[in-house]
Amino acid sequence: MTRLHCALSLALFATPVFAALPVTPAPDQAALLKSNDPKLAANKKLAYDFFRVVLRARHLDEAGKYMKDDYIQHNPNADTGIVGFKAYFSKLGGPMPIADTVPGLVAIQAEGNFVTLSFVREMDDPVNKGQKYTTTWFDMFRIDNGKIAEHWDVATKAASPSK
């Protein structure tokens, strides 16, 4: 094998491939809620149900069942505290039917007092106009005494929501 052939072969294998596989949701969300540790299983269920009932279906009247009053919010679009949370999400519209599952849910991880839900996120492709690609979005919660005490996600500042 010539030096040129070796160099070309190495260059081929060293070149990054940009054909990422699409992110796909978990086929069995009930399995994601399981844990050998009862506390972790309870924390997963709390975060999952909060997401289904309060965030997705906007049953804001049930927020106190899941959240502490002094809830800490790290999303730059919503205020800290349950009152600020409700004020922000009330702008998105009224309650909707509560689904049995969360659309696009990929995984639920729990460790200590933290639970992370990750989701499929479809985005406009900036390189290929008119096309979409998938990536991952997440919401992380800190649980304190059986209620959500703190929240993080990957949100950036947005225009004020409207109904």
Task: Give residue spans per PLM region.
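N-terminal signal peptide c-region/cleavage motif recognized by signal peptidases
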Residues: A14-P16
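C-terminal and inter-domain tail/linker signature
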Residues: A19-K163
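Bacterial N-terminal signal peptides that target proteins for export
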Residues: M1-A7
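Hydrophobic helical h-region of N-terminal Sec-dependent signal peptides
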Residues: L8-L12
